[in-house]
Amino acid sequence: MTNIRKTHPLMKIVNSSFIDLPAPSNISSWWNFGSLLGICLIAQILTGLFLAMHYTSDTMTAFSSVTHICRDVNYGWLIRYLHANGASMFFICLFLHVGRGLYYGSYLYLETWNIGVLLLFAVMATAFMGYVLPWGQMSFWGATVITNLLSAIPYIGTNLVEWIWGGFSVDKATLTRFFAFHFILPFVVAALAGVHLLFLHETGSNNPSGLNSDTDKVPFHPYYTIKDILGVLIMITVLSSLVLFSPDMLGDPDNYIPANPLNTPPHIKPEWYFLFAYAILRSIPNKLGGVLALVLSILILMLIPFLHTAKQRSMMFRPMSQCMFWILVADLFTLTWIGGQPVEHPFVVIGQLASVIYFLMILLIMPITSMIENQLSKW
């Protein structure tokens, strides 16, 4: 008799995705981040659900309701900080996952890659709206500054901003709709992640060598289930250490001051995971130019498959490209640092240089480096 996991309509899907899935025998720990992102998403949806039970999306009570969660709800402080720092873990895993894709040429699976970029956009939108909900100073001013950027769109800009705000400034209507969107978007992300996996399983996973691995596959379970569980345990250790020892390390102290439209914080800045994009936005003195650069800094990922000039897929055997890749990583760290600094000399110039290097690396330097490597290896 055939095993039930291979015949039952629902279990068959689980079986072909997580149990009998043929996986390359040599995928490294860099391939763990997909499963970690899945765990992060589930954790965020669950903690978010419990927070939503006690949260009120009204400008008069939002800040107080978050205080109430932390003080009066059983383990409310734990749920709140797991949710806030869980977002940071989510983005750490996202950036490493994207970095892995860039390094090993996984972007050549076009559908999987493009849906991944859409996922990145959706998660960033969710995180932005979630940051507005506690209705602290940084929540309010962050929402004001970022939504205001849309006014740079010619002709419809001002109307668009007021439509999003639901009035003439960020107020009750804005908070209520942001809460609604923040609640629904993670489920959209979950659906997109399902499609992401669907397309991935059409081709199978890439591997560190970038070569076809059809001749050497192993079943996903038990090999990679065990490997993924180790990754999950490490992530839980890091997250719980962060939550239990220094829950506010990655947050902004200004967000413990209730939102006040009459008082602007000295330095308006987003959460750390948006700082690189924020630095690119600020490095251009023109409003529309800055907004375009901000969007392109992520959208440029969709161009990467078309900029692949190398004969080999992975960077594993391409030392010059490796060097360029790590310069790009260092540049992103620089941008993240600059995004958190005030707008003054020398930070402005460093930010502008780092922004130019970011776009030059991806659009010009890395494709040219690959061409040089092709010549050197006598292809």
UniProtKB/Swiss-Prot annotation:
SUPFAM superfamilies, per the entry: a domain/subunit of cytochrome bc1 complex (Ubiquinol-cytochrome c reductase), Transmembrane di-heme cytochromes
TM annotation in the entry: 33-53, 77-98, 113-133, 178-198, 226-246, 288-308, 320-340, 347-367
Residues bound to heme b b562: H83, H182
Chief localisation class: mitochondrion
Protein localization: Mitochondrion inner membrane
Names of required cofactors: heme b
GO cellular component: mitochondrial inner membrane; respiratory chain complex III
PANTHER family for this protein: CYTOCHROME B
Function: Component of the ubiquinol-cytochrome c reductase complex (complex III or cytochrome b-c1 complex) that is part of the mitochondrial respiratory chain. The b-c1 complex mediates electron transfer from ubiquinol to cytochrome c. Contributes to the generation of a proton gradient across the mitochondrial membrane that is then used for ATP synthesis.
Additional record remark: Heme 1 (or BL or b562) is low-potential and absorbs at about 562 nm, and heme 2 (or BH or b566) is high-potential and absorbs at about 566 nm.
Family: Belongs to the cytochrome b family.
Protein name: Cytochrome b
Originating species: Crocidura orii (Amami shrew)
Highest classification ranks of the organism: Eukaryota, Metazoa, Chordata, Craniata, Vertebrata
Chain's gene name: MT-CYB
